[in-house]
Amino acid sequence: MAENTVYFPEAFLAQMRAAMPAHLSFDDFIAACQRPLRRSIRVNTLKISVADFLSLVAPYGWQLTPVPWCEEGFWIERDGDDALPLGSTAEHLSGLFYIQEASSMLPVAALFADNPQPERVMDVAAAPGSKTTQIAARMGNAGGILANEFSASRVKVLHANISRCGISNVALTHFDGRVFGAALPEAFDAILLDAPCSGEGVVRKDADALKNWSPESNLDIAATQRELIDSAFHALRPGGTLVYSTCTLNREENQSVVQWLLSRYPQAVEILPLGDLFSGAADALTAEGFLHVFPQIYDCEGFFVARLRKTAAIDPLPAPGYKVGKFPFTPLKSREAAAVTAAANAVGLAWDAGHTLWQRDKELWLFPQAMEPLFGQVRFSRIGVRLAEVHNKGYRWQHEAVIAFAAPQRAFELTQEEAEEWYRGRDVYPQTAPQQDEAIVTFQGVPLGLAKRVGSRLKNSYPRELVRDGKLFAGKV
């Protein structure tokens, strides 16, 4: 791999020299920052087991090296990436894996280190969705996740990734993360705050990441981070777990933010050390029990992770003064819900008791039950999965519902050529058409969408915004 030419401000280098632990080499740090970042993926276990995924891609010649802290994570080397980008492979398009930097898998690994079974989790800064989808997989689509994103332009990307991965237990919000402590006090069993930061750890991916860097900027960012962690801590129930993480390397945005929380609530914060998180974690362990990952340690991005427990209740913040407005959905009565469920089952859609049916005008939605106590307390951008639209002849089943709730045994398998046509938004002409009028189409046993049979043709319903042009997947060799 060709080396990057990374811009390093002198003040940054001086700061890193001072922060570097004695057992690490500063020269190795500079050398690691100049090397291009290794690519990595995470298998989406909501759709496929790790073992089945490895068997599926074995013929492709991909070199997959396990990520020590995430059993679903792998560094990947493959030939032909220029000809066929990883994001255009069949397995990515159908949500079997997520392209995710290895370091960014650490916070969720820390959140679930003791195999907890949280009912309600918040991801405070969620876009583009790598950690939200990782949390959902660890929860098995059970319970509920509030995924918040402050940037309006990134909410759409967040939803697209959640939908592609077949996730049904997420509610999206679009707020400054500092509102939740007052709006949703003690509402969550676990919270991930992957805080906005100066990004010092991402220079291997972006050689110009430090162009606007300054010590003063770091201090300004740290002030915001303190407000975010304070809000998150108020939103956490006593006994719950908070993971604070950044992709930066300075102490002001990392250790100092956590120490500020400790000094503010000394009777209520307990550090949960991460030295046993995975084999080799001790190489990045700080004296406090945090992980401070310099790029040369594991040949990945720089990262910081702290895991905390809330041991006692704290004084609540003043109640917010805004009005949320009337909740625009109503739950379906049991008789109506039974009719919708039966119609969905007939086309091959099924869900568990952790989801309930709600209606807004002609739209039918499936909401995660675990989120219902929060309805009316904050305004949601989106909740759960849009199941269908009601029309004169029945129901128009929505693409995201097919991806989340399709039962593979009620499906019509496409050939590779037919699947490529499907992803290009074209109708499919199989040799033998399915018997039913509507059929869930699959490739590699994974749902791609719902097709309507018109004679010998399968009419494509793939959403226009997802249609792909150019070369798609290569198939088995």
UniProtKB/Swiss-Prot annotation:
It is found in: Cytoplasm. It comes from the Bacteria. CDD domains: AdoMet_MTases (cd02440). It catalyses: cytidine(1407) in 16S rRNA + S-adenosyl-L-methionine = 5-methylcytidine(1407) in 16S rRNA + S-adenosyl-L-homocysteine + H(+). Its EC number is 2.1.1.178. One of its GO terms (biological process) is rRNA base methylation. PROSITE patterns: NOL1_NOP2_SUN, SAM_MT_RSMB_NOP. It holds the Pfam family Methyltr_RsmB-F. The keyword Ubl conjugation does not apply. Its main location: cytoplasm. S-adenosyl-L-methionine binds at A125, A126, A127, P128, G129, S130, K131, E149, D176, D194. It is an enzyme of class 2 (transferase). The active site is at C247. Signal peptide: none annotated. GO terms for molecular function: RNA binding; rRNA (cytosine-C5-)-methyltransferase activity. The keyword Signal does not apply. GO terms for cellular component: cytoplasm. Keywords: Cytoplasm, Methyltransferase, RNA-binding, rRNA processing, S-adenosyl-L-methionine, Transferase. Coiled coil: none annotated. Belongs to the class I-like SAM-binding methyltransferase superfamily. RsmB/NOP family. HAMAP family: 16SrRNA_methyltr_F. NCBIfam families: nop2p, PRK11933.1. Specifically methylates the cytosine at position 1407 (m5C1407) of 16S rRNA. This is Ribosomal RNA small subunit methyltransferase F. It comes from Klebsiella pneumoniae (strain 342).
